[in-house]
Structure formats: structure tokens, C-alpha cells
Amino acid sequence: MVDEGILREVYRVLEDRRDRPIDSYTSRLMRDDDKMAEDKILEKIGEEAAEVIIASKNDENLVEEAADLIFHTLLLLVYKGVPLDSLLEEFAARRK
């Protein structure tokens, strides 16, 4: 079983792509410092959410599509400057 350390690792990579852009898919999505970058990320989240719904109905690729949705959601949090700990603390608060 994998622990939440993998989320931290993915989050660090996303932060690195934001802070030291290279020619990668992730860097390109965050490249614009204006509303266009955010809109592109939000559009991807919408696409991935739809793909999760379709995968759920077809019982195909659900895990892969869910991972894509979570990845793009984390990308949005990084773009907006939200620390990963804020997300984890919110999950912890909901357990109570």
C-alpha cells in the first residue's frame, strides 16, 4: 500500500514545474500568469471529471481517470498557491 507520501511527491513536482518551468505538459498549463492559465486548468478538470463519470458507467479505466482528475485538481491548488497541508488538514477535519 502506498501512503500519502506519493501525494507530497507529486505536489513537489508540480511546484517545481511552476517555479522552474521546463517544456512539459504541466509547465505549459501553468505558463500564463493571467486568467488564461487558470481557465485551461479548470477546463482540464472539467474534462477529467466527465471522463471519470464515463469510466464509472463503463467500468473501464476508472482508476486511471480518477488519477487524472486528482492530478489536475492538485495542479490547480499549486497554481493558486494552496499548500498541500491545507488540503490534508481539511480531510482530517472532516474525519471528526
From Swiss-Prot:
Asked if the keyword Amino-acid biosynthesis belongs to this entry, the reply reads yes
What Gene Ontology cellular-component terms does the record carry? cytoplasm
Enumerate the Pfam families for this protein: PRA-PH
Gene3D superfamilies for this protein: MazG-like (1.10.287.1080)
Q: Output the GO biological process annotations, alphabetical, semicolon-separated.
A: L-histidine biosynthetic process
Q: Which UniProt keywords apply?
A: Amino-acid biosynthesis, ATP-binding, Cytoplasm, Histidine biosynthesis, Hydrolase, Nucleotide-binding
**What are the GO MF terms of this UniProt record?**
ATP binding; phosphoribosyl-ATP diphosphatase activity
From the Swiss-Prot or TrEMBL record, state where the protein is found.
Cytoplasm
Q: Which HAMAP family match?
A: HisE (MF_01020)
Concerning its family, UniProt says: Belongs to the PRA-PH family.
Q: Under what name is this protein listed?
A: Phosphoribosyl-ATP pyrophosphatase
Q: Supply the source organism for this entry.
A: Methanothermobacter thermautotrophicus (strain ATCC 29096 / DSM 1053 / JCM 10044 / NBRC 100330 / Delta H) (Methanobacterium thermoautotrophicum)
What lineage does UniProt assign to this protein's organism?
Archaea, Methanobacteriati, Methanobacteriota, Methanomada group, Methanobacteria
- The protein's gene is named hisE
